[in-house]
Amino acid sequence: MLEDELEKLVIKYKIDDKKAITYGHFNVKTNFVLPLPGITIYEQTGLNFFFIYFDKNGITFFQLNEKNQVISKSFISWNDIKDFKYKNGLLLEDEMIITINNETLKVKIAKFKACNEWLKDNNTYLKGNNHFYK
């Protein structure tokens, strides 16, 4: 379960503030769509899920595999971020837009996930403590 992997992450990486972690993925790119009678075939790239940790130094992305286990870690310092925007979505996801030098990353932040009440609580905590706004 996702919450079990979150607990492992907190212990392994000695994370001080468990509530400063959320869950999301980078924007998905659709490469092609092939509509056929009775079925539609499409190819997408970029669907990698992450635990995303915010602290005073920056944002850490912990990439997850299909079992929601951490397989890699990437860090972006607040000093390296040229522009940071957070847009509230209508239904399932919000969007975080990070600009580093000339590159823009679009990250979808899940508002909730079935059987994972912590996600909604953590997102409320992050918004309330201004973590989503540089």
Q: Each predicted region: which residue ranges?
A:
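Short, conserved turn/kink motifs that form compact alpha/beta structural patches or helix kinks used as
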Residues: 55-67
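Acidic, Ser/Thr- and proline-rich intrinsically disordered linker/docking segments
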Residues: 5-11, 15, 70, 74-134
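Anionic N-terminal interaction surfaces
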Residues: 1-54
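Generic preference for well-ordered secondary structure
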Residues: 38, 43, 65-68, 103
